[in-house]
């Protein structure tokens, strides 16, 4: 968990009179991200450790940080053209490529695949998600070019709406037996599959959230990709 790591580092730095403040935002809400950016700029810290979830807003922030000569480091996903001082996390594009490889392992024919994405408030998709999807689609185009990819939007915090969305989707596309989600919400799909006694869907997700791990142990998720 990133927060635990930052907390531990903050304790170690206390003797050096270094104060670490954590600013949280909703990764599914661009407005929340913008508010956190404004807080950073107002406080004008000596350095910034940032998860650049929304690319365009991150570009705006880093431009201001450079003007103020404030160094910044990225975690979870990278925006290489912004030349952060450092980056800690998995290679998002390569992880998407790997996800496709695992999902289609031993597959001899082209098949329909579902990509489950979370609705986000704002005009931007997650930078990390976009990179993962690009890597995923690259593998598909390289080895299974006739595969049909279906995108399904679900809600991060609304089970009732998700149940209807997923029911309608699987009823309309009964041929789909493989799916992937590029965020930490794979357990939402796994919960639906469990509740509806569906056990023939191969699902891949990201991040070692407890709910994801439980679904993995129950074989409702086949693989979890994580950097920690």
Language-model features: where?
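Hydrophobic alpha-helical
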Residues: 35, 40, 47-66, 136, ...
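Short, surface-exposed alpha-helical segments at coil->helix boundaries
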Residues: 3-7, 34, 93, 97, ...
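Flexible loop/hinge segments that line or gate small-molecule binding clefts
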Residues: 57-94, 210-221
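Amphipathic helical "hinge" segments at domain boundaries
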Residues: 1-34
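Hydrophobic alpha-helical segments within soluble ligand-binding/sensing domains
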Residues: 87-114, 162, 212, 228
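Short helix-capping segments at alpha-helix termini
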Residues: 12-16, 67-68, 140-147, 194-200
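An alpha-beta-alpha
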Residues: 99-143
